[in-house]
């Protein structure tokens, strides 16, 4: 299980990404627009660099909702592979059945 502080850090990052998402998208659009002048694109890049480090979506990590495990997490369920297995065998995940062919 991941420490509670790790889970809280990830939650804080998600909130920062959501807070700065609009500004981030606007600046990225300016930077990637070839029709803009070099000076405008340069100032947009400087403004992007002044955003908080944790405001970048690339710093987010998918974690298991139950354990906080960072690897082996399925997006569909939001759970780690071992927790999916446990819950599926108990029958707690609707529609998931053991495969047989």
Curated annotation (Swiss-Prot):
GO molecular function: rRNA binding; structural constituent of ribosome
Keywords tagged on the record: Ribonucleoprotein, Ribosomal protein, RNA-binding, rRNA-binding
InterPro entries assigned: Ribosomal_uS14 (IPR001209), Ribosomal_uS14_bac/plastid (IPR023036)
Ribosomal protein found in the keyword field: yes
Any one GO biological process: translation
Gene3D superfamilies recorded: 1.10.287.1480
GO CC, any one term: small ribosomal subunit
Family classification: Belongs to the universal ribosomal protein uS14 family.
NCBIfam families, sorted: PRK08881.1
Function, in words: Binds 16S rRNA, required for the assembly of 30S particles and may also be responsible for determining the conformation of the 16S rRNA at the A site.
PANTHER family xref list: 30S RIBOSOMAL PROTEIN S14 (PTHR19836), SMALL RIBOSOMAL SUBUNIT PROTEIN US14M (PTHR19836:SF19)
Subunit text: Part of the 30S ribosomal subunit. Contacts proteins S3 and S10.
Cited HAMAP family: Ribosomal_uS14_1
Protein name: Small ribosomal subunit protein uS14
Organism for this UniProt entry: Methylibium petroleiphilum (strain ATCC BAA-1232 / LMG 22953 / PM1)
């Amino acid at each position: 299980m991941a420490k509670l502080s790790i889970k809280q850090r990830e939650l804080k990052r998600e909130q920062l990404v959501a807070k700065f998402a609009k500004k981030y998208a606007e600046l990225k659009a300016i930077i990637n627009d070839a029709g803009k002048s070099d000076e405008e694109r340069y100032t947009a890049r400087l403004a992007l660099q002044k955003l908080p480090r944790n405001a970048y979506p690339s710093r987010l990590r998918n974690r298991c909702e139950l354990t906080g495990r960072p690897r082996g997490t399925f997006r569909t369920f939001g759970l780690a592979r071992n927790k999916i297995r446990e819950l599926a065998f108990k029958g707690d995940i609707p529609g998931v059945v053991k495969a047989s062919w």
